[in-house]
Amino acid sequence: MSSPQTSNRMTLRPIELKTANAFVTTLHRHHKPVQGHRFSLGAYVGSSLVGTVSVGRPVARFGGDPLVVLEVTRLCTDGTADACSFLYGAAARVGKAMGYQRIQTYILATETGTSLKASGWTDEGLAGGGQWKHTDGKPRRTDQPTERKRRWAKMLS
């Protein structure tokens, strides 16, 4: 992109993972920062960061070929109107420009997905949830929601 893209009063900028993770640490309701990413984007109003999206390889074991499929692993906003839709749409456009064929994400089953629907994503239904165990039988982290998830996706090609 040669110049920042705007939607209403928001501006899109690439950001470093540490910036996205700091935002998530401060504002995300139920998740911690991510370990890695392919790219992260920030939504700004003026000079204020109002939302971030981190996009990486598919996390689930059978989530898709990481050279073809991207996954939104974190999206976090400060509540600014339309920031979620702005970031989901931007993530899909950037993924398409990079040559990916599909982008997906998982949200809690109790979340509505309104921003995803507004951005042209498709609800693919319930997927996953619960809690896995380590191969040695020890329980995994319990600081994340264990309820069912809904997978949403958008074809990019």
Task: Say what each PLM segment does.
Residues 1, 156-157:
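C-terminal end-of-chain micro-motif
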Residues 1-34:
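Short amphipathic alpha-helix that is part of the acyltransferase structural core
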Residues 11-14, 38, 45-46, 52-148:
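Acyl-donor binding region in acyl/amide transferases
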Residues 24, 41-44:
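Active-site and channel-lining beta-strand-loop segments
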Residues 33-41:
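N-terminal carbohydrate-binding/catalytic regions of secreted carbohydrate-active enzymes
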